[in-house]
């Protein structure tokens, strides 16, 4: 109170409270740039028009045709992701020796993983990604009406089960990505894989049909122009689902129980050289691991050992 003028000078306490820390936090967040990272695994058997072995081998008569198609469709997905706000994009070349894509066609913002052998093979380096997309994927071994049906190693593996479920390469890789909290949001490939596995195990993932097979070496595919449009809109839908939080990682339980059926007893004999492998049949073995990534590594090692045995026996 200013007694000289009769004026009340007492400061009134504001009814509004000021949280300085909350204000600072909000101010900082308003300037934070969120970097989104996508991971693309590219196989070849599920690509359109691939119907003969000559499409799939480095010295195959039609190999260059498939390289161009796979690169072209990969670029469609890469560009669609970039337009949707993904600044970091990793492409994993994932067929055979894993040196198939035409590197000179890839934009500067893409990092390419290529070469084999490598950890977790088809999903090397997936950790730290926000989303994963699989292109050119095919059905598992023993699937009817599916071109080049096989599971990872067509020459040695008859069937692979993880925790009692027979898996395709799609499911093997999806479990591995899920272990590091990465959801698969789009799969493009053979119709039979999309129906048998993708729709069943990851119903939230966009499914883009690149081919519909009449058998192991015959299939029908739309024109490239239509496929490019399908992939473009598919990526847009998949990213929208991700941003709306309607996608999720697919995680298998641990410990991981693996059952493996080889195509002959030579391979099962060889696998028993590892102490953690238990023989349960003429062609059958099983093992248990603490993590999905560990299961993948042992499985991959057994496939490589089988390939070595096959080469040795071929020369005898």
What are these regions (language model features)?
Residues 55-79:
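Short catalytic helix/loop segments, enriched in acidic residues and glycine
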Residues 109-125:
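A glycine-rich helix N-cap at a beta->alpha junction
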Residues 213, 227-316:
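C-terminal accessory domains and tails appended to enzymatic cores
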Residues 117-118, 154-180, 189-193:
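Active-site glycine-rich loop that binds ribose-phosphate moieties when present
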Residues 176-239:
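Active-site rim beta-loop-alpha module in soluble metabolic enzymes
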Residues 35-39:
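Extreme N-terminal starter segment of soluble prokaryotic enzymes
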Residues 41-42, 92-93, 132-137, 187-188, ...:
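Short beta-strand segments
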